[in-house]
A protein has these predicted regions:
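Conserved RNase H-like, two-metal-ion catalytic cores of nucleic-acid enzymes
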Residues: 2-140
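Mixed-charge, glycine-rich, non-catalytic linkers/tails in nucleic-acid processing enzymes
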Residues: 1-18, 106, 112, 137, ...
């Protein structure tokens, strides 16, 4: 550039940008859910892994629900989920509330601990997407990891992913739409689906 020699800068190299230091993340503690859970948890499912066995598609690794609190990951059986879903001492940010409401209602509950659903938020933010999966949303929202977890690879990024999605909903001016219409509707639809299945079952039994 012609200004460089004029100001005597031709021997001066620009300072290289400092490289971002690689931070070594802690490994999550994997432990059973406490008998008396309390506080705020993030709940999601590790998707099932399928593969071929001869000509048949088989499940190589079943879907597995888990909860995250700070840097602890709790693998969840159905009984654990039921203890979380209607618990006055617990609040839950979840990804995909529909099957969780179904589990709660099947156990005589209502899923009252669920306060936010990331899958519903993803739909609201991009209604044209063909599917909504945590593994695809993490790079889309550049969600940072708080820890690593070999058994549940997405667990460490859930907190940042959910925070970024909440911020995006606020930035789009859609808090009221989400909180007052979409989120309550999810619970109602889950109840209607359950009731519809029960009605159909009774009707089939009467018809038979």
């Amino acid at each position: 550039h012609s200004l460089i020699p004029r100001f005597g800068l031709d021997g001066v190299a620009p300072e290289a940008a400092a490289e971002e230091e690689a931070v070594e993340l802690p490994e999550a503690e994997l432990t059973p859910l406490p008998l008396t859970p309390a506080g705020h948890y993030l709940v999601a499912a590790r998707p099932a892994v399928t593969g071929k066995q001869g000509t048949r598609n088989v499940v190589l690794q079943p879907e597995s629900w888990y909860a995250v609190q700070d840097t602890t990951v709790y693998p969840l059986e159905d009984a654990d989920l039921v203890r979380l879903l209607d618990n006055a001492d617990v609040t839950l940010d979840v990804f995909n509330s529909a099957p969780l409401y179904a589990k709660a209602m099947a156990a005589g509950g209502w899923g009252s601990s669920i306060v936010w659903d990331g899958k519903l938020a993803a739909y609201l933010l991009d209604a044209s997407a063909s599917k909504y999966q945590i593994s695809e949303l993490i790079p889309a929202y550049k969600a940072a990891a708080a820890f690593t977890c070999t058994d549940y690879p997405d667990a460490g990024r859930l907190a940042d992913l959910f925070a970024r999605m909440k911020a995006e909903i606020t930035a789009c001016g859609e808090d009221a739409l989400y909180n007052e219409i979409e989120f309550p509707l999810a619970q109602v639809l889950a109840d209607m689906t359950r009731t519809g299945v029960l009605v159909d079952k009774d009707g089939i039994e009467q018809f038979g």
